[in-house]
Amino acid sequence: FNTDVLMALHRKQNLSPLLQAVKEHRVVNPRGTEPFNVKSMFEVMTGSFKDRFHQEIVQRTPWTRQFYQRQTEGPDGETISDLIEWTRGHWNDLVLKPERGYSGHGVRVGVVNNDIEEAINLALSEGDYIVQEKIPLALWAEEIPYLNNEQIHIKQYQTDFRCLMGNTGLVGFVGRYGGVPTNVGSGGGFQPLAILGSDMSVRDAVVRVNDTIMNMDPGELLDVIAHQKNMAMDCDFTYLLGPVKIALRPRLITAGQIEALENYGEKLWADCLTLENLWLSGQLDDLIRIEEEELEIARMNPWQGSAAIIASDGLFGFGAEPLE
């Protein structure tokens, strides 16, 4: 959890032993990752500092700006004289979200949330929001079977895919599916991962797997779902009151795509070190809006490339999105 959550708990429960562990560098992730782990850092990577980062990382990062009345540069390099008015006029292509948050709380998405005035008022009243270029929802949409009233159906879900990087390289992935946003706290679930070993395309493989599931006996599929729930409970794979939802079809990726993601992860890790250096040198002071108490904790435990897990859902597709 973020350091602001840590401090809120500390004020209620006295977590001095945990803070001492932070000071002694016994916590993963180091709290020093926090200042450059906020969503406003996407502005650094798509703004005036973008030449400091790998071109691939910049290209796979959506245009982002801290949201308040200001002049700035738009997604295509155009001058924006008033960001709030510009957001109002381009809402269908944008997203507003808190700089720090989880479970999709406070996120507003153009088209999905049509009331632009409510979205803008929320962002301005809460403060510390970003406005971000909306990624075409179809890029991460997948058709996945589901069971309802003992009948099998196909539904188009939104998915996301996160690479997990450590100091030794790429260490794993997390796939989620659901609505918009896909956060588990907003009713989403997890999608397992399978590596496609044949020469067929990802889309053809997805169609074949979906067809196979659609032709199953609903009773057999009920047994599969029950088995998923039991495994989730046995492994403490739960959220709040019960087992996390698990998709009936895995996300399919190829060995070549994994190799490309390993390369992406190496570059991202290096660029995170660049972000930390920019923060430590004071060059990001105008962008990082964190209370001084939290910054003191971050300074207790600088990262500097030590053991950590960094998650990223950069802009990449895998070929499973539905054809228009």
Predicted regions and their residues:
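Preference for protein termini
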Residues: 1-324
